[in-house]
Structure formats: structure tokens, C-alpha cells
């Protein structure tokens, strides 16, 4: 096509981060970038549908916002794609559910911190990214609207529990990403915008 969304400096870094994380984990993957026309849920959801139409089987989404009572209808419109693994970042503001991570049709991806741990088999220790005092950290919590899916058996939330899985997200050990659009070049990124594409790439490796 020839009609593309306008370039956006706010999204440029996010896009570069997502592409770099997928290619780092799965260098042989065929990567398809689908951009939404705006940041509205309808346009973002339409981009997910478009990716599925184009043949994508593993889709990463690094965005989210406050929940809304209309989210359950968006679930069926945009995220109910049997046979397609859809990952969504859980957010970077600590405790509190965000959408579309709350959708029962997606894998909600939280974040961890890695630290060197010499003398251990793995060589690293891993803990949840965030602090007990609040502020920046991996999003988590109980959905206010989305029903608990049958595959969740925890008792902590009456409705959908977030997150499902996690991957490294701490900006303190972030990824150097080159942003060529209205930016200063190399920047270090982290957050669950990094962990969501990691998990999508792992799904792709697993087939």
C-alpha cells in the first residue's frame, strides 16, 4: 500500500525496541511490522486484526491503558484469534490492571530484574521488577471487568489476574536501541515494552 500512518516520535522508540527484542531472541524469525493509524483502541485493535490477516501467528503489543467497561467487547473484536499467540505488556506503573493485558485472549507479560549471582548454576538471580514503595515497576493486579478465564485457577482475583508470565524488563539492565527519528541516536530502553516481544519471540521459537 501507499497510505501509511504519520511518523510519530513517541512511537518510534517503542517500535525500534520491539523489533530489536524479537530479532535478538529469534534472529531467524520473519518480522512483520504493522502500525496503527492512531493510539485509539479501535485502531490498535484493527492493527492486530490486520497482522492476523497477513499471516502472523505471534503478535506482540507494547501498549496499554486504564480499563473500561467496553473492554470485553474489544476482546472479541480484536484479540480472539484461535491459533495465534498474542502477547501484551502489563504496564510499567506497578500495581494496577491495564488493558489489553486484561484480555482473556492474550498472554499478559510482566517484568523482572536480573542481577549477577556468581556461584550459582544460572549465574543470575531474578526478582520482580519494582519496589514495595510503589512507582515504576511491572504492572500487575486484578481486572475490574474481564472475567477470569478457565485456565486461571488462582484465588487472588475474582476476575482476570495479571500477569501470566514475565521476562526481564528493568531499565537498569535495559537494551541499547538506535532511534533514527527525531532522537539522539542510541538510547537505553526497558519496561514491559521489552518483555512482551521477548515472550512473543520465545513463542515463535517454540513453534
Feature names for model-found ranges:
Residues 1, 25-26, 73-75:
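Generic detector of short, locally flexible boundary/turn motifs and exposed helical patches
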Residues 1-20, 29, 34-39:
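Active-site-proximal loop motif in hydrolases
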Residues 23-24, 50:
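Surface-exposed acidic, glycine-flexible loop patches that form ligand/cofactor-binding
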Residues 24-27, 102:
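Solvent-exposed polar/charged
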Residues 19-23, 98:
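Active-site phosphate/pyrophosphate- and oxyanion-stabilizing loops and adjacent acidic/basic residues
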Residues 34-207:
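Extracellular protease catalytic domains of secreted zymogens
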Amino acid at each position: 500500500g501507499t497510505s501509511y500512518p504519520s511518523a510519530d516520535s513517541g512511537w518510534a522508540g517503542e517500535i525500534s525496541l520491539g523489533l530489536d527484542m524479537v530479532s535478538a531472541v529469534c534472529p531467524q524469525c520473519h518480522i512483520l511490522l504493522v502500525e496503527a493509524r492512531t493510539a485509539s483502541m479501535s485502531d490498535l485493535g484493527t492493527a492486530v486484526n490486520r497482522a492476523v490477516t497477513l499471516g502472523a501467528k505471534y503478535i506482540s503489543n507494547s501498549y496499554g491503558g486504564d480499563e473500561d467497561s467496553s473492554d470485553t467487547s474489544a476482546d472479541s473484536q480484536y484479540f480472539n484469534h484461535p491459533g495465534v499467540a498474542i502477547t501484551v505488556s502489563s504496564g510499567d506503573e506497578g500495581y494496577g490492571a491495564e488493558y489489553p493485558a486484561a484480555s482473556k485472549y492474550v498472554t499478559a507479560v510482566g517484568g523482572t530484574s536480573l542481577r549477577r549471582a556468581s556461584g550459582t548454576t544460572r549465574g543470575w538471580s531474578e526478582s520482580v521488577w519494582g519496589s514495595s514503595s510503589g512507582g515504576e515497576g511491572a504492572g500487575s493486579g486484578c481486572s475490574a471487568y474481564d472475567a477470569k478465564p478457565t485456565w486461571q485457577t488462582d484465588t487472588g482475583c475474582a476476575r482476570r489476574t495479571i500477569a501470566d508470565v514475565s521476562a526481564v524488563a528493568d531499565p537498569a539492565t535495559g537494551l541499547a536501541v538506535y532511534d533514527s527519528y527525531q532522537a539522539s541516536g542510541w538510547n537505553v530502553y526497558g519496561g514491559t515494552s521489552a518483555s512482551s516481544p521477548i515472550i512473543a519471540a520465545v513463542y515463535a521459537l517454540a513453534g
